[in-house]
């Protein structure tokens, strides 16, 4: 059973624009990289590079799936401009074609993933589209000639992959605003978890305010999260806030 690994692009990267997205389409790509070792893990490393301008949601190879963005954020993968439907309303999936991999298995894994995403986001099969739809690029180059067969494979792929738990550990205990401000790894863990859910300590600042310090802006991010999730909005992180964060990070 293939595993989905969440390995998100840092929120500070330019290729993680952070625009909210309600996905209406799923866009399929081939990586067009046949080099040995050009698997999902390598592409996960590439897309996190601060100098990379493109971004997409998933990369699939013959043994694993890497997720690079939350599906409620857009990526830059469709080539139809800043406000294009492909970029702003579609989940981007890259299928690896590395020479030392099994492309047919990677394609099968992608079909399972697409089926899963269709169910979770109420996306019909006729909105699973090739990259070519948005920009005219001959992509996914290895699937275009038998696109209908690829779609038929999605319809018959009813066993979705196993998804791993998110890699965002949460601190225990109670954390609140104090003087002097509390600092440490536990604060950093909390800030990263909040940022993944779009409750940034200081969006637009360096690393969106993720600095390991529980100051007023981080307390405000906690308060905003609590307010939006039916908790007492006091800006104090405790067991109830931890439990709610954990449920949202699944």
Swiss-Prot record:
Q: Which Pfam families match?
A: Amidase_2 (PF01510), PG_binding_1 (PF01471)
GO MF annotations, alphabetized: N-acetylmuramoyl-L-alanine amidase activity
Q: Which EC number(s) does the record attach to this protein?
A: 3.5.1.28
Query: Mind telling me which SMART domains this protein's record contains?
Result: Ami_2
- Compartments it resides in: Secreted
A GO BP annotation: sporulation resulting in formation of a cellular spore
Q: Name the reaction it catalyses.
A: Hydrolyzes the link between N-acetylmuramoyl residues and L-amino acid residues in certain cell-wall glycopeptides
Keywords assigned: Cell wall biogenesis/degradation, Competence, Hydrolase, Secreted, Signal, Sporulation
What does the record note about activity as a function of pH?
Optimum pH is 7.0.
- Gene Ontology CC terms, in alphabetical order: extracellular region
Q: Domain N-acetylmuramoyl-L-alanine amidase spans what residues?
A: 45-141
Tell me, using the record's free text, what induces this protein: Expression is GerE and sigma K-dependent.
- The broad enzyme category this protein falls into is hydrolase
Q: Which domain of life is it from?
A: Bacteria
Keyword Lipid biosynthesis in the entry? The reply is no
- Signal peptide coordinates: 1-44
The record, for InterPro entries, names: Amidase/PGRP_sf (IPR036505), Amidase_domain (IPR002502), NAMLAA_amidase_2 (IPR051206), Peptidoglycan-bd-like (IPR002477), PGBD-like_sf (IPR036365), PGBDSf (IPR036366)
Give the chief site where it resides. Answer: secreted
Q: What does this protein do?
A: Autolysins are involved in some important biological processes such as cell separation, cell-wall turnover, competence for genetic transformation, formation of the flagella and sporulation. Could play a role in mother cell lysis with CwlC.
Family per similarity comment? Belongs to the N-acetylmuramoyl-L-alanine amidase 2 family.
The entry's protein name is N-acetylmuramoyl-L-alanine amidase CwlH
This protein's species is Bacillus subtilis (strain 168)
* Source taxonomy: Bacteria, Bacillati, Bacillota, Bacilli, Bacillales
Which gene holds the coding sequence for this protein?
Answer: cwlH
